[in-house]
A protein has these predicted regions:
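Conserved glycine-rich acetyl-CoA-binding loop
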Residues: 1, 10-11, 26-27
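Conserved acetyl-CoA-binding loop-helix of GNAT-fold acetyltransferases
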Residues: 1-6, 31, 84
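Amide-forming acyltransferase catalytic core, primarily the GNAT-like/NAT-type
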Residues: 33-122
Length: 181
């Protein structure tokens, strides 16, 4: 898992999401920096007959959702079509599923956060991210911008990478949909 996180960081990925297959995995993924601050919701009822533009309007109407691009949308639709060919009783997800999110790039995540909260002024220290040591640094959020430094800042809030995700999404109901389960 550490290697996967490190590789994702170098591909400029900001967040990683997953749906644990079994209950005990929630604790295991939490030790890897994931937090249960995201819900996987069922897709719109008529998603199989939607074109991407219609789906895109639907997903963008949500206040805080993981966005799918056209390629991802087409892949998920094709995978479901294949699943139904194998098992005609296969059904799309019907219930909300507690899922998990991890910050891969703290600076990029805080930059997105600062852009949405230009009134926010705070110093944050991320610590104890053993998977991505580049995240373990001080950040100053001010006037919609983020700066990073190796030097301690005054009145700093210290957060683990998991706590940082909880901090960033504290006021949001984060959703994802169209996940293969």
């Amino acid at each position: 898992m550490s290697q996967a996180h490190f590789r994702l960081y170098h591909k400029d990925v900001v967040f990683a999401t997953l749906i644990p297959a079994e209950e005990w995995l929630y604790d295991w993924y939490a030790r890897c920096g994931y937090t249960q601050h995201i819900t996987c919701t069922p897709p719109p009822a008529d998603v199989d007959s939607m074109d991407f533009d219609t789906f895109d309007r639907w997903q963008r109407s949500k206040p805080c959702i993981v966005l799918h691009d056209k390629e991802g949308f087409d892949i998920v639709k094709e995978d479901f079509r294949i699943a139904q060919a194998i098992d005609p009783d296969a059904k799309r997800q019907q219930n909300d599923i507690s899922s998990m999110i991890r910050i891969i790039n703290a600076e990029m995540a805080l930059t997105l956060y600062a852009g949405c909260h230009p009134e926010k002024e705070e110093n944050i220290r991320v610590y104890n991210d053993s998977d991505i040591p580049m995240n373990n640094i001080y950040f100053c959020i001010k006037k919609g911008k983020v700066t990073r430094t190796n030097y301690p800042l005054p009145d700093t809030r210290s957060l683990t990478i998991q706590e940082l995700a909880d901090y960033i999404f504290a006021d949001d109901t984060l959703l994802m949909t169209l996940m293969l389960n």
